[in-house]
């Protein structure tokens, strides 16, 4: 029915037939429906009409009661209503009536609310009294009657005689106060300008100006506002300025005298024009009658011309300066700024010279330092100053959180709030050029890409911030962990028991309390610790970064540790990983890579060496020197005497090991002496020759000695972030510290009166040689000294000392003069021998000739391995780092080390292209097992698959050049050991290196190699390791079974033991990977090192062959009890089986468990280079299965400062640790734990290349000779220059730093440096370098990577083709 009701046809037709005739019968229901519908409609119509009428009548009634005054009140109230506020914005506020006991309290409020310009007219004003006079005329206190109430106001009256200009000025001054309505801005209630005199009616503030109020309170201390009130007032002033700026107004005279205070102590910016009269002393009146608020005005607004003071218009940044002074004035209760200085002094010192700054207010405030920090922000340069909004945000936060938030939490949030991204200062914040610390911010060029990650609630801790800075040298990744502290070295990672044991092992007695461990390479840090993972675009050579099993066992490293030289080099290389510190004298090594404070703060090295005696010494020493090192302070002692060889000891007998503080002291002394003597990295530096004495010309240094970076490079032991080559080597730190100091190695050099050579290993050889004894003792001594100095430092491999051999190292002879150039700081009495040794060491470094690199498998696996890798790199990669050409072989060694990645970075094909030297590569005979991968730094930053980590095929035999340099005609009577230096390209497995630290190390190595290679020409008396430079970069020089390990010198000491061993050999006991030639038996006789052309500076990386105990060398490395002495020289199994006196750093006696794996493992690791190398790098040293007679060697980290030792121990876990612990570490292998401010610089392998900029322009001009194929590098001409291999050209491209591996062809693991001590031994051809894939950086805070930053540089692309391109070309100059 309902439907029918609404059907018109039915409704109207239902009662009619189709014709319209009415139906006789009507349905009753239908009728009712029709009626109901009708009534409903009628009712609806009536309701609508009534509604309309009611509405109309209501409106009419409202109008009837409307009147003008009421309308205004309504309008006024409407403006304050929420709806209106929403429409008009926040500029208009209805101020609540303040409930104050004072009778006048409500008056101002009501006047603000109710008085309108229409209400206020001349007729409604009642003058009460005159309160002052201004430039315009009189100021009166008046009262306005608005009908229902009255309110007090201030009336400014313009004098009737005012000119039109004055009239305009009078009205303009009040414009902001009329247009803006804000609780912290004085309001102008009305202006009466219809007739003269002009009147301005201002809001009345009963307490007057803020300055007068505070001064009165200061007199009556009981009335002084409490600090919280003052802080609130400061926020209100900032809020008022912010509102002005948002509306494009600036205050021309911001100061407390121009801020007024209401009855409820609310601050309002504004004035009545009485300041000039009341505070005459606050103004400097010029001859032109300009009133200048000199003590508040920003310096850029004032200028002086012909004794006339000129003032420009105020700016927003100028207001911020004045705001800072106003806040200072507030906290000083109205004290005039610079109260002790006259206006002229303020003008001279504050305005003109900008030297005088206001001191911190004496008022005791919560977070007073932060308040003062904000003030200082306001006084930065105009472009660096925070905005008013930033200042207000900071002050508001300080007020709100200062009293309630825990200090630690506050600090974290504070950094995130600071203008400019918060934090250059906090590694994380790094952003604000203005606020990161006046200096930090000013100099900051960081881009806080990850600022959002520091936002509230992103991290529970919020302590970590990663700042990525794009620099000419590459990307700087600054990551700071604030939550952790040195006290909790392994909080999340280790169980209490393990932690205690670890510290006991790693931080022997006397070790600094703090430990900064590089726990494991694999697992992300547990808990709140973070690790940085460098991911490779494509896996390189199937390298599995996480494959711990692939990495050579730490024990192998131990054996390598025996090789002092290698170890030393490795430790230098590791040093950057452990904490590159710019060299002490670093101009170039800026602490950027590793903040010194970080080291200083971090007694990181508690886990210094497995050996309690040696470990504490090396690490403990590092603590003191860490400051010098910055983070690089691995083992300052190591750097001082990384090889354990001390310039101090010249006698055949090794110096007694120093223990504890004694060792530290001696290390310090040696270091000082060494610094004086060594400019370039001594054996300690991974860049065996890369360090040049400061005296060297930066360019010449870069070009002359691979191991000797240019002076400016030298200072910066670690390359700039953009300087991958330099920083990679621990050397950089050493160099930076002292022009004449090779960290760790200087001892070696100084020994025997040999001038401390810049070469890394040279000191051991030099010392050995200088000891002049055929006593292996001399070598052991070097090792021992290094140990003593560095504690866990690996002794330099016992290299037949020139004196032992009775013949100077040939290669060094020529560079004796060069040596002075290279080592101006260090006398080179036995320059020939020393230089030769250095060169040899450099070559060995570059060519992984020194097993010591591997040696660092003992002690901390991470530290040892990293150190080992570093040393390996130092000996091999160190040279590599210094000489990309040497890198391949060293890479093998590097892989052994936890740091090897950095060494891998050092792997810079410098070995391949180094000065024409072919790298001695055990892989020449066979692939170095763990080299490719073992080099992983253990930092997750490194991705082995990353192109950076891709070993480039050795297309250039840089190392041979280095070796040739080393071998280059030494005048020494001792037979030259000829090392076939052609280095085979690193296996693709080897191409990996840690981009983060290793790239730094590598850069350092590269930079070092460049300069040092130049030095290679010098020959040192005594046997030289001649590294025939094979033209073929792919060639690898292998140590002859009989030859390698010993210099074939007359004395066993001459043996260049594992020194030649490839990095490939993992931290395994044997330095040389199986691919390497078997360890040479005791020297069969003086081996002639083929002299190679050497630049003016000689590479001073001397690897001291450590006579195998089995061989019964007269002496073993003597060192601290912890040092691995006799056993340290371990046979390298890599060769045919002839035991080779391993070059090793004497470390504190480590248990056999520390021994590195046998070379076999190295080979195995070569097979799984990536994994093995990584394992070697990260795994705690385990007794190597293959280490038969090899005593576990603890890698010696060569550091300029003793604090470096700490880093070393952290990087390498002592093999003493239980297998369980080692396993745990391996499980966490990829975790890098920092418990202090840590700056991590991640560089793409290629990114540090010249494209990123030339850290050392001079170096660029003169690329390392090895790169150039300088005469110092015999093989330079023969083998492709590394630079050529690298798209960027020579390693020197990086401003004297070596190009990254990507720049150089990556060497295959097989290309691990093998040294053929036998001159006749041909060097195997190095595999053609494989293009390095682009690498990308993934920063992983926590197991899951929060963000991934991919940085692909042109050099990366170049590097891909670089290995191939570089195969035959000479190194290019950056």
From Swiss-Prot:
One GO process term, biological-process aspect: brain development
Biased composition (Acidic residues): 1158-1173
Matches recorded under Pfam families: PK_Tyr_Ser-Thr
Processing and modification events after translation: Autophosphorylated. Phosphorylated by CDK5.
Principal location class: membrane
Binding site for ATP: 131-139, 156
EC category: transferase
Reaction catalyzed: L-seryl-[protein] + ATP = O-phospho-L-seryl-[protein] + ADP + H(+); L-threonyl-[protein] + ATP = O-phospho-L-threonyl-[protein] + ADP + H(+)
Subunit structure: Interacts with CDK5.
Function, as annotated: May be involved in neuronal differentiation.
Name of the protein: Serine/threonine-protein kinase LMTK1
Organism, as annotated: Homo sapiens
